[in-house]
Amino acid sequence: MVQAISEFSGRRPLVLTVPGLNGSGPAHWQSLWEQSRGDVVRVELGMWDTPRRNPWVTKLDQAIRSAEQPVLLAAHSLGCLAVAWWAELAGQPWGWPVAGALLVAPPDVDRRDMPAEVAGFAPTPRCSLPFPSIVVVSEDDPYSSVQRGFDMARDWGSHFVNIGACGHINAASGIGLWQEGQRLLDRLIGTAEGPMAQGAGLNEILASLTHEEAGLRTI
């Protein structure tokens, strides 16, 4: 494994977008990133309207394993839960093959009023993720509270970012290409291109990303 990490260290990572329930439409930031960036492709999980945890995790695992370079995950909504479940079940070592993840608007699947389609993703995994990660939440997300998002970030060992009132951080939020999110993603890319070491990189990434530059608030 050390040899494999050494072989691919320094290569620009592939960014895999992981949409949530019903997929991501053409105006969603994930779709726009896929169209505008040469390093971003979508994971075709299938069953977008009737998601199932195990098939989604299997499809995600196949996409990750087939990449011939480090992988970063840019997940939205229920896609964040697919990533968390993959991390719990896959048992990867620190930072390989997934070198980092941007987890945007993870829903609280443990709530009783959540859509029935997401029930199979409960309970929310609580294991620490084996890669640097950033959880991004909104103050008026109908599918999760700021506190619940903070709890997930704490359990997963993720940095926590609150961007204020931005709904579910999707196409309806009117954020277009979501430049702030791309800045966070690019910081993760920066550390994935360097040597991989447990616990290294994330603090430096976020320390260099000022609030003014990103337009974000952290707590």
Where are the language model's segments positioned?
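Gly/Ala-rich beta-loop-alpha elbow adjacent to hydrolase catalytic centers
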Residues: 73-84
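Catalytic histidine neighborhood in serine/cysteine hydrolases
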Residues: 39-41, 154-170
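Conserved alpha/beta-hydrolase fold motif
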Residues: 72-73, 101
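Active-site catalytic motif of lipid deacylating hydrolases and related acyltransferases
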Residues: 2, 9-69, 193-194, 198, ...
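Short beta-strand/loop motif that positions the catalytic acidic residue
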Residues: 129-137, 141
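Conserved alpha/beta-hydrolase "acid-adjacent" motif
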Residues: 25, 142-148
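Active-site nucleophile loop of the alpha/beta-hydrolase fold
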Residues: 20, 44-48, 101-111, 138
